[in-house]
From Swiss-Prot:
Belongs to the universal ribosomal protein uL3 family. It comes from Aliivibrio salmonicida (strain LFI1238). One of its GO terms (cellular component) is cytosolic large ribosomal subunit. It holds the Pfam family Ribosomal_L3. Part of the 50S ribosomal subunit. Forms a cluster with proteins L14 and L19. The modification N5-methylglutamine is found at residue 150. The keyword Signal does not apply. This is Large ribosomal subunit protein uL3. One of its GO terms (biological process) is translation.
Length: 209
């Protein structure tokens, strides 16, 4: 099943009737408008392209303006694609709302994680620190050995070392939907989701539910 594109508003908490506090992330899921339907015959695969939100007219390029005009939808802040399974049918200009999650209990949320800049191995990869004393006076937060000797004589690709952390696409799976507020286009999801406040997130039905 397809998902929806939303915007992370922030975190809060709600209480159950028993008085239990549940931390939730509020995701504003504005109406997603179908801007293109892709088929096996024309594109080699089945998918729909959606947009949401709005964009200033002077920020819309001519190719984008023509694309949105052809679909008959308002220019949005971006374009996203969802692959279609056999039997799913949509029309250009159709609108998808948060109500499609009324019968769904668990979702996967994809976003761009917060950028942390250049970080060391301890923060980036959760390495343990070395001794603070006992003869160690220089290498408290150093990673330690990064390889072997003349054989192989190099550092293997993928070695966990210091470097740029965050600002990459990631997915948090199997998050519980606590509430669907169709009137205000809000989705309350238990726990944290990737990204900063105001960032775009993609909410899909959980694949492992």
């Amino acid at each position: 099943m397809i998902g929806l594109v939303g915007r992370k508003v922030g975190m809060t908490r709600i209480f159950t009737e028993e008085g239990v506090s549940i931390p939730v992330t509020v995701v504003e899921v504005e109406v997603n408008r179908v801007s293109q339907v892709k088929t096996v015959e024309t594109d080699g695969y089945n998918a729909i392209q959606v947009t949401c939100g709005s964009k200033k007219a002077n920020r819309v390029s001519k190719p984008e303006a023509g694309h949105f005009a052809k679909a008959g939808v308002e220019a949005g802040r971006g374009l996203w694609e969802f692959r279609l399974e056999n039997g799913e049918e949509f029309t250009v200009g159709a609108e998808l709302s948060v109500e499609i999650f009324n019968e769904i209990k668990k979702v996967d949320v994809t976003g761009t994680s917060k950028g942390k800049g250049f970080q060391g191995a301890i923060k980036r990869w959760n390495f343990a620190t070395q001794d603070m004393t006992h003869g160690n006076s220089l290498s408290h937060r150093a990673p330690g050995s990064i390889g072997q000797c003349q054989t192989p004589g190099r550092v293997f690709k993928g070695k966990k070392m210091a470097g740029h952390m965050g600002a990459e696409r990631c997915t948090t799976q199997n998050l519980e939907i606590v509430r669907v507020d169709a009137e205000r286009n809000l989705l309350l999801i238990k726990g944290a989701v990737p990204g900063s406040t105001g960032g775009n997130v993609i909410v899909k039905p959980a694949v492992k539910a």
